[in-house]
Regions:
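Binding-site signature for planar aromatic cofactors or substrates
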Residues: 1-170
Length: 170
């Protein structure tokens, strides 16, 4: 399962969450890709603190992560963008993510026009689209147990780079 719930905060301190796809784990950092001009992108540009949640109801497991997000390199974003399906690349170029649009037809027309523009060519990544690497500073692992006596373990990154581990009461 690669779906993660991403939490960010507006400049006014209002939280918002949405589901994105986790695309990798590199050097201990969680990687996902998005439109930098989306609501989450704008919020991360002003406040890099982020939360990630993985929820597996069937397994009665959850992992909650807090940390900071930073853009990955343009080269890393380009590499991943080239691997995306053709229609997803076109969609990334034309979608004004999180902005109001007049109609679905407006989106479809823009898609058809952009697809014709790139016919037979390699679709380039738009500058407003790319990846984020989330460096965790706190991770909580939760395992459901009978009688609500769940297991909870909190990992907190210390200034020396080592993780402190504590069992938490359910």
């Amino acid at each position: 399962p690669t779906a993660i719930i991403v939490g960010t905060v507006s400049p006014e301190g209002r939280p918002s969450t949405r589901t994105v796809l986790l695309k990798g784990l590199h050097d201990g950092k969680f990687i996902f890709y998005t439109n930098y001009e989306s609501r989450k992108g704008r919020q991360l540009a002003q406040n890099p603190y982020i939360s990630l949640s993985f929820v597996w109801h069937e397994l009665e497991r959850q992992v909650h992560i807090e940390g900071t997000a930073a853009k990955v390199s343009p080269e890393e974003s380009d590499e991943y963008f080239r691997k995306r399906p053709y229609k997803s690349r076109i969609g990334a170029r034309i979608s004004p993510q999180s902005q109001p649009i007049a109609s679905r037809m407006q989106l479809i027309r823009a898609f058809v026009k952009e697809a014709a523009r790139w016919l037979g060519k390699e679709v380039e990544r738009p500058d407003n689209w790319g990846g984020y690497a989330v460096t965790p500073t706190r991770m909580e692992f939760w395992q459901g147990r009978p009688n609500r006596l769940h297991d909870r373990f909190l990992y907190t990154l210390k200034t020396d780079g080592k993780w402190e581990i504590n069992r938490l009461s359910p």
